[in-house]
Curated annotation (Swiss-Prot):
Region spans: Interaction with FLCN and FNIP1: 285-733
Domain notes: The TPR repeat-binding motif mediates interaction with TPR repeat-containing proteins like the co-chaperone STUB1.
Ranges where the record places region Interaction with NR1D1: 629-732
One BP term from GO: positive regulation of interferon-beta production
GO terms assigned for molecular function: ATP binding; ATP hydrolysis activity; ATP-dependent protein folding chaperone; CTP binding; dATP binding; disordered domain specific binding; DNA polymerase binding; GTP binding
Subunit description: Homodimer. Identified in NR3C1/GCR steroid receptor-chaperone complexes formed at least by NR3C1, HSP90AA1 and a variety of proteins containing TPR repeats such as FKBP4, FKBP5, PPID, PPP5C or STIP1. Forms a complex containing HSP90AA1, TSC1 and TSC2; TSC1 is required to recruit TCS2 to the complex. The closed form interacts (via the middle domain and TPR repeat-binding motif) with co-chaperone TSC1 (via C-terminus). Interacts with TOM34. Interacts with TERT; the interaction, together with PTGES3, is required for correct assembly and stabilization of the TERT holoenzyme complex.
UniProt organism field: Mus musculus (Mouse)
Protein name per Swiss-Prot or TrEMBL: Heat shock protein HSP 90-alpha
Region (Interaction with NR3C1), start-end ranges: 9-236, 272-617
Amino acid sequence: MPEETQTQDQPMEEEEVETFAFQAEIAQLMSLIINTFYSNKEIFLRELISNSSDALDKIRYESLTDPSKLDSGKELHINLIPSKQDRTLTIVDTGIGMTKADLINNLGTIAKSGTKAFMEALQAGADISMIGQFGVGFYSAYLVAEKVTVITKHNDDEQYAWESSAGGSFTVRTDTGEPMGRGTKVILHLKEDQTEYLEERRIKEIVKKHSQFIGYPITLFVEKERDKEVSDDEAEEKEEKEEEKEKEEKESDDKPEIEDVGSDEEEEEKKDGDKKKKKKIKEKYIDQEELNKTKPIWTRNPDDITNEEYGEFYKSLTNDWEEHLAVKHFSVEGQLEFRALLFVPRRAPFDLFENRKKKNNIKLYVRRVFIMDNCEELIPEYLNFIRGVVDSEDLPLNISREMLQQSKILKVIRKNLVKKCLELFTELAEDKENYKKFYEQFSKNIKLGIHEDSQNRKKLSELLRYYTSASGDEMVSLKDYCTRMKENQKHIYFITGETKDQVANSAFVERLRKHGLEVIYMIEPIDEYCVQQLKEFEGKTLVSVTKEGLELPEDEEEKKKQEEKKTKFENLCKIMKDILEKKVEKVVVSNRLVTSPCCIVTSTYGWTANMERIMKAQALRDNSTMGYMAAKKHLEINPDHSIIETLRQKAEADKNDKSVKDLVILLYETALLSSGFSLEDPQTHANRIYRMIKLGLGIDEDDPTVDDTSAAVTEEMPPLEGDDDTSRMEEVD
């Protein structure tokens, strides 16, 4: 084996090298990692830092019951040491370390339960970045390394070295190198084309992206050069003394790490010789920079955090150029422990409701280790605009998506997040200006919530805002509407439509406005779905003014008059129903019209005109539903209108008057249009109107037209409803 020949050059006193074969599934996984192209190789560093963090968690946990466990090293930290000369990247932690048995079992001979599952997921097209969720994150090192060396020291064992170039086997030997005290050092011998991971900028970028909120300091050691100005001999001597002192301190503090990067003694001697001649010299030094100084903001006390800090964190989290609109920072303790920080952005993303869109934008951490940012079970889809982090103390670090779906802990977290989001919106509603901005961007989400979330429907309904017939240019809540209701008013009246002007001028609101009853204008397509679920508010039923059975507050006298009108027009209603046949379910005398002659209303459980329009616009609509949901139309006539009164007299004078049919059909089609419906055959309706115009202008149907070509067109025009239809139109006066 190449590993063994390598180790034969080692000093004689070293113990014999043992070679082990990788367990079959692990060998297969490594081969898959090495031989497949992955674009996001950078995740190897996240996995190794997470492993270090786990090891540090373990020793910290053990030290709680036995403080002497930390005698081998009190400081808990992670160091990253890139070396361009050796083409190695070293990750050192002062965690619990591994015994010889741990090394052999954990890194090669015993497959984790997730190994096979992860390989299957990979072959099915899963992202390599999921590797940590299957407990095999260590092997991601081979995405960038041709050889990996692991040196480790556990309190209960000697220091050992594990090494493998992934050729199906690995070696383990006692390590006689620099004593570690306690912990693990992973040395990655990088592939030739992966040297970007030795660049200071690249390492910082990856740590910031993936491991910014690890609970232990991550320090990057970089060898740098600096210019040194020398003014005269005295200053030179003074500087030399200071340098020696600094060098001694550094050697005593960071000996192992500095040796990893490479000793600088020769260079220092060389410099000492050059210094006398030059005024300006170059000096090498090891720069140490802590990369995750920002303690996870969500672990701090909310009282100690300024709005600016929240703003900076929000921008770094979301890459948004604007400040957030609102923030909610809270922790839950008791049987379950987690912290969360939630933000409402100022504007909705342009692809908020796209299917391919991530279902949520909340990052899930487990004990400060980032797990995933697309956990669908964390928050309902209607809140997918909320940004933030959730950090759980109870979820296992190697949790998979399947486990998350079943997790009871996650269900409790989700319930709390929804509750806190609604609290946040309610707080936001107290500030009219900010709530207006919020509502403009996210009202659809609130309405979608009412449609989907039955548990929180009541709270969500309090967040709704609408224009009404009495609100002018200001949107009001349902609560405001209820405070303005008339004494004998039992219902909340609303109308759905396309625009505010269209619904305000609708025939349906005439009588209500005359009576001084306020009508809510619902002018977004989603309102139709929302109101199907929102049956009532504070004990008051929501009633559509475009549907049958509209009850208006009436006194006894009004009721009596209405009954008389019904009797008077009963015969006309019957005649109209016979003419319209299946087009309408029934024709009745209306109590909602004032200036319009008639209108089309729908049955209580059928679609409104607006809903029918929306459904017809669906590309993937179900035509079978269209049939029974859209067919229930009722024609209501206004008994006080001169057109209806004259039509009644005409029908009663001569039951066989052929012009009555055309007038009824014309009235029906016009009512369809004014009530918001579309015509099935607009051309026939147009021809009917043109004939009426001709009659109005006194033009005889048989008169030749001015232009021969247009005469030809007239001749070719199809009859309206058979030949007898034409003769009836001619009889219209």
